[in-house]
């Protein structure tokens, strides 16, 4: 979490990230978290 201080602010986005993380397609919807997750994958 320390890596993205910006995301830490919006707690509502936190739970949303977990959902897209599993589906993969959802990550693209997030855009912010989707881009990093794609690179890791």
Swiss-Prot record:
Sites bearing Phosphoserine, chain numbering: 14, 19
Species the sequence originates in: Echinus esculentus (Sea urchin)
Cellular localization per UniProt: Nucleus; Chromosome
Function recorded in the entry: Core component of nucleosome. Nucleosomes wrap and compact DNA into chromatin, limiting DNA accessibility to the cellular machineries which require DNA as a template. Histones thereby play a central role in transcription regulation, DNA repair, DNA replication and chromosomal stability. DNA accessibility is regulated via a complex set of post-translational modifications of histones, also called histone code, and nucleosome remodeling.
Post-translational modification: Monoubiquitination gives a specific tag for epigenetic transcriptional activation and is also prerequisite for histone H3 'Lys-4' and 'Lys-79' methylation.
Feature: compositional bias, Basic residues: 9-41
GO molecular-function terms, A-Z: DNA binding
UniProt name for this protein: Histone H2B.3, sperm
Coiled coil region boundaries: none
Motif SPKK motif 1: where in chain: 4-7
GO cellular component entries: nucleosome; nucleus
